[in-house]
Amino acid sequence: MLTRPLLALSRPMALGALRPAVLVRTLTTAGPTTTVRSTPIITPSHLSTLSRSTPFVSNCTLSLLKRSFHVSSDARSAAKAEGKPKVSAYEKANMRLAKIGVFFQLSWYLGIILAALGLFGLVWYYLIMELVMPSGDVRIFNRAFKEIEKNEDVMRVLGGQLSSMGEGGGGRWGRNQPPVSKRGIDKYGREHIWMNFYVSGDINEGRAKLELVQNTDSKLSSERFVYRYFVVDIPGHKRIYIAGNAAEKMEKKKSTGWLGVNWGKSDDE
């Protein structure tokens, strides 16, 4: 007589143990109507909880539950397999080609960025070397032109409103080019800089020649290079010495050769 009440009491307990089970919703379409059914999925943890909490459930009931668990697991696996889209070989090839295209596109953009950075660095290097450093051609030319404007002899022969031009190797086009220097190292390790350019005024036109030599004794940037000679040659006039060696020293070098001839190449050529 006690068996039935105990079995009756065990059903709510079993149902309570099955409450945390996962619900699987199934859509069934029949004509214009769609039916949604929720089916509880029993996991192994639920079976172990059920066996511990309801000792009066028969082995037959547990076996039925286990069987239903396996069936529900198979149904869930089949549902996942059906829900996952199948990718064909053609689509996989297109995906690989798309990835390759993105890779090359990013590589192209990266190359453009690196090239722009390199060009920016070259521009900055040119600005620093030519405009800031005392050994730059622009700094040397500006310094020499200011020295010419300060010289009274040059201004008297050339006239006012001085203008400068390039070395003039290629006619008018060559004279319109900015002055370019030539550089070399002597046997003492000092750097030498040579520069020639034309200077014209209202009256005449002359050619300026200069040589700078590295001053290893001075640590000042303004005195890093000193004039070895700086002269201006004007047709029909004597050579005018702007800076560097004194006039008598330059004349002495020209007249102290053997038999009155200066052997070798002159420094101002």
UniProtKB/Swiss-Prot annotation:
Localized where? Mitochondrion inner membrane
Q: Which domain of life is it from?
A: Eukaryota
Q: Which UniProt keywords apply?
A: Membrane, Mitochondrion, Mitochondrion inner membrane, Protein transport, Transit peptide, Translocation, Transmembrane, Transmembrane helix, Transport
PANTHER family listed in its UniProt record: MITOCHONDRIAL IMPORT INNER MEMBRANE TRANSLOCASE SUBUNIT TIM21
Q: Give the record's subunit note.
A: Component of the TIM23 complex, at least composed of TIM23, TIM17, TIM50 and TIM21.
**TM annotation in the entry:** 108-128
- Look up the transit peptide and give its residue range: 1-76
Which residue positions does the secretion signal occupy? none
What GO biological process terms does the UniProt entry carry, in alphabetical order? protein import into mitochondrial matrix
Membrane topology per the entry is: Single-pass membrane protein
Q: Which Pfam families match?
A: TIM21
> Record's Gene Ontology CC terms?
TIM23 mitochondrial import inner membrane translocase complex
Q: Which family does it belong to?
A: Belongs to the TIM21 family.
- Which InterPro entries does this chain map to? Tim21, Tim21_IMS_sf
Organism encoding this protein: Yarrowia lipolytica (strain CLIB 122 / E 150)
Task: Please describe what this protein does.
Answer: Essential component of the TIM23 complex, a complex that mediates the translocation of transit peptide-containing proteins across the mitochondrial inner membrane. Required to keep the TOM and the TIM23 complexes in close contact. At some point, it is released from the TOM23 complex to allow protein translocation into the mitochondrial matrix.
Provide the membrane-side ranges marked Mitochondrial intermembrane in the record. Answer: 129-269
Which ranges sit in the Mitochondrial matrix compartment? 77-107
- What protein am I looking at? Mitochondrial import inner membrane translocase subunit TIM21
